[in-house]
Amino acid sequence: MASDEPAKVEEGRRDAQGRLIVSKALGIFFSGYLEGSYTQNFNNPSNGINQLRIFDVNANEFRPNVAKFVLDREADANGTGWDRAGFHVKFNAGKDSQFIGGTNLSPYADFQEFYVQYVLPVGTGLDIKAGRINALIGFEGLESSENPNYSRSWLFGLGQPFTTFGIRASYKFSEQVSFSIGGINSVTSSTGDSTNKLMVESALVWTVTERLKATFYGLFGPRPGQRPGSDGNRVLGGGFVSYQLTEKASMVLEAYYANQERASELSRGGNARWDGVAGYLIYDVNKEWGVRFRSEIFEDAGGFVSCNGTESFPKANVCFGATQNRTSRDVAQTLWETTGTLQYRPVASLLTRLEYRYDKSNQNVFQLGNRATSYQPTLTLDVVYFF
């Protein structure tokens, strides 16, 4: 009985990461958060939609973004047998769930991630994961609270995968270099499309110095086109570099290029190309206050990844001219935006953000009242409660 006492004491408490310890003996943890937001669109679009947004689509109204629940067991590369095994389950409920999951459980609830893990005793440990996992591609991710800003960049929201389903292997060659590669047959993204054909994703992480870190990523394989029978190979390659300027300030620069065969009805060769670059400046005034800035340019040369939404739920990636049943016309465009975010975190369990964003296009894809325009200014208050 005495040997069981320490484990019982720890259960029900939280670890250094704030996770609830469900079972110390089994190494199982529980965590999650609730998020809600309100966005004021100064264009006051008559359809109540923020154009070309993915998750923050509701104009001039409150949005119950997500209730996120996570249950996981971490695999220990230094352990033996059962210690090397792990699992991860992440369930979402709320309006942000539409594009995140891959099981189509319901429009407002789905599993974002569910995978099993085992670290093989090869070298420093060959980490194998199988199931649905957040994609390797991109600096930003699905967890809003882990991104510098509340709203997502177009680089992420329009042009990158959200989650993938398949098998992934990761290996740490040294303290400076690690590599991951995955064979996948399903992808979730803002277009909601998927395929059962094999694709490959990869990421190389290089820690150059304590302050400088670089990540290079890639994706290749067949993807659906805009019309039936127009499937073609997609190639996406790029990366991001982060640099710690001072103890309180850091910056990130991301860029990538993507091309898909037979996906565009606007380009002469039929191929769709999209690319972009984004820069971030992150500054923490103290433990409670911080400011974040983002600026990006995104080009959809083939008119393939932007303006694919309708005015029906989930109302994402919508452009002027869309209706309840159809998208707006295909348009090749160059987009750029600037976002500033003031962050206040009075306690570890509460994150609040006030964000101003200005969107601009070389085409009239945004909506001012009931007419088309080329710009869109918004102001958002976002609140996240961690448990």
Describe the residue ranges of each PLM region.
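Short structured motifs
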Residues: 15-17, 339
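Cleavable N-terminal export/targeting peptides
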Residues: 1-8
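Outer-membrane beta-barrel pore domains
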Residues: 53-56, 97-102, 212-387
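Active-site environment of divalent metal-dependent phosphoester hydrolases
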Residues: 188-189, 224
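Outer membrane beta-barrel
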Residues: 17-188, 194-201, 205-213, 280-301
